[in-house]
Swiss-Prot record:
Main function: Acts on leucine, isoleucine and valine.
InterPro entries: Aminotrans_IV (IPR001544), Aminotrans_IV_CS (IPR018300), Aminotransferase-like (IPR036038), B_amino_transI (IPR005785), BCAT-like_C (IPR043132), BCAT-like_N (IPR043131), Class-IV_PLP-Dep_Aminotrnsfr (IPR050571)
Record PROSITE patterns: AA_TRANSFER_CLASS_4
Pathway: Amino-acid biosynthesis; L-isoleucine biosynthesis; L-isoleucine from 2-oxobutanoate: step 4/4; Amino-acid biosynthesis; L-leucine biosynthesis; L-leucine from 3-methyl-2-oxobutanoate: step 4/4; Amino-acid biosynthesis; L-valine biosynthesis; L-valine from pyruvate: step 4/4
Keywords, comma-separated and alphabetical: Amino-acid biosynthesis, Aminotransferase, Branched-chain amino acid biosynthesis, Pyridoxal phosphate, Transferase
Protein's UniProt name: Probable branched-chain-amino-acid aminotransferase
GO BP of this protein: isoleucine biosynthetic process; L-leucine biosynthetic process; L-valine biosynthetic process
Family, similarity comment: Belongs to the class-IV pyridoxal-phosphate-dependent aminotransferase family.
Positions carrying N6-(pyridoxal phosphate)lysine: K155
GO molecular function: L-isoleucine-2-oxoglutarate transaminase activity; L-leucine-2-oxoglutarate transaminase activity; L-valine-2-oxoglutarate transaminase activity
Species, as recorded: Rickettsia conorii (strain ATCC VR-613 / Malish 7)
Enzyme Commission no: 2.6.1.42
Catalysis performed (reactions): L-leucine + 2-oxoglutarate = 4-methyl-2-oxopentanoate + L-glutamate; L-isoleucine + 2-oxoglutarate = (S)-3-methyl-2-oxopentanoate + L-glutamate; L-valine + 2-oxoglutarate = 3-methyl-2-oxobutanoate + L-glutamate
Cofactor: pyridoxal 5'-phosphate
């Protein structure tokens, strides 16, 4: 998916119940969440004017906020209606949708019971882009935090600091993305996507209890099972990936992306069997437009 430049967007965004022209959507420089990463968000995609898995995304948005102790002044149905308002106002067909919940600028104290909780829903024009060419991964030196040190199932801004750093380092070395390990050295995910491996028509994917269990990940598992494929969720070590013939990642924006190689430092593992990933990609693109 390719994005237009943000300054070229002329759509309206929804902020706390009001539709605001994109260029006038602003927050104060002393906004609490800007300083302390106290915000949560979702990444969603609209296909033919309908957001895929909107109810699931919205429920997770609220759950993410509650995990950080934020009081969300809207329920699932109200947030869904706000999405519909944005889609109708901007005549959206295909777009990336970004809901964001953040704390206001009433105080810079670490905790303050009088901080407001705000909600934004913005649409960003997008169009599908061919991902026929696979990408290459670099194993990041950074590890995912322990689940008891951060709410890993909360899609919070703070969770992305390491992901951003890891991806920057990978790209500087000539790779498209980074593979992240958990605190015990098991394979976790990529910076913004979940990872799958293929061998003998069986899918292997890390257990999603140490990182965000992606909605696209869950959908791909459902599709794979419907196609008669076996899916195994396991703890996976780096040394195991030499046994796999295929690899791909999943995410809302990227959908299904083939992986051509993973550089382990002392050797590069090549994946040249993309048949199952391509089949899943085809079926996923059908499902999201139903």
């Amino acid at each position: 998916m390719t994005m237009v430049k943000l300054e070229q967007i002329f759509w309206h965004v929804w902020i706390n119940g009001d539709l605001v022209p994109y260029q006038f959507a602003r927050i104060h420089v002393l906004t609490h969440s800007l300083h302390y990463s106290g915000s949560v968000f979702e990444g969603e995609r609209a296909y033919n004017g309908k957001v895929f898995k909107l109810k699931e995304h919205t429920a997770r948005l609220i759950k993410s906020a509650e995990a950080l102790g934020l009081k969300v002044p809207y329920n699932v149905d109200e947030i869904i209606k706000a999405h519909e308002c944005v889609i109708k106002q901007n005549n959206i067909k295909d777009a990336y949708i970004r809901p964001l919940i953040w704390c206001g600028d009433e105080s810079l104290n670490i905790t303050n019971q009088y901080l407001s909780t705000n909600l934004l829903i913005a649409g960003i024009p997008s169009m599908p882009r061919s991902f026929e060419k696979g990408i290459n991964l670099h194993v990041s030196r950074w590890r995912k935090a322990m689940p008891d040190s951060t709410p890993v199932q909360s899609k919070s801004a703070a969770q992305y600091n390491m992901a951003i750093t890891s991806k920057k380092e990978a790209k500087a070395l000539g790779y498209e993305d980074a593979l992240l390990l958990d605190y015990e050295g098991y394979i976790a995910e990529c910076t913004t996507t979940n990872i799958f491996f293929v061998k003998d028509k069986i899918l292997y994917t890390p257990i999603a209890d140490r990182f965000l269990n992606g909605i696209t990940r869950q959908t791909i598992i459902e599709i794979a099972k419907d196609l008669g494929l076996e899916v195994k969720e396991e703890r996976l070590k780096l040394e195991q990936i030499e046994d796999f013939t295929g690899c791909f990642v999943t995410g809302t924006a990227i959908e299904v992306q083939n992986i051509d190689s993973i550089d382990l430092g002392n050797k590069k593992i090549i994946f040249d069997d993309h048949k199952i990933a391509d089949r899943l990609k085809e079926e996923y693109r059908r499902v999201v437009r139903e």
